[in-house]
Amino acid sequence: MDYNVFTKPTQTFGSAIEDSSLLRALVIVLISGLLAAFFFSLTGMGNLALGLIVVWVIVQWFVLSVLLFAFEILFSGQKRQFVRADFKAAATVAGQLWLWVLLLEVVLLVFGSTLFSMAPMIGIAVLIVIGVAMLIDLFIGIRVVLDSSNGRAFLVWLLLLIVYGLILSLAGIIASSMILL
């Protein structure tokens, strides 16, 4: 499997669909979740909160995988059956996107731990560039998964971003209200 999602996303997502591995994608997501929990442990959070952060990262990946799978079924021009291999491919593509999240966390570690006054500003600029690159790779991943034109992929990309944001916002509200109880 090719992990070069940064410079060759089309080939990476294509090979991820051909050689889909749910375990590899889950390992990437778990590493990302553990790294995020490590960052929050530096703030003095308790172990329960750190475990919830790892679970939250896994939930984000799972929601994105389910949405990619659903949009693949809805917007592909062919009649498809609900096949487990298709979900594995969508989950693998979402796992490949999580390499960007790992890169974001490394940038936060590098620029967030420096004492220079200009380093956080440079870090914010780098985070913005990485965020835009991740959105572009999400579009490319959708285009590869759907095997469609740019117009259809752009529509699915917009719908995916909106629905993904709404679902995660609702899940965050429910989770925070459960914690407050």
PLM features per residue range, with description:
Residues F38-G46, V107-L115, I174-S176:
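Juxtamembrane "helix-exit" motif on the non-cytosolic side of transmembrane helices
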Residues M1-V93, W98:
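Selected alpha-helical membrane-embedding segments in polytopic membrane proteins
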Residues L166-L181:
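Juxtamembrane boundary at the C-terminal end of a transmembrane helix
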Residues T43, W157-L159, A171:
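Residue-level detector of alpha-helical segments with a strong bias toward transmembrane helices
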Residues L48-I73, A94, W98-Y164:
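Selective recognition of hydrophobic, aromatic-rich stretches within alpha-helical transmembrane segments
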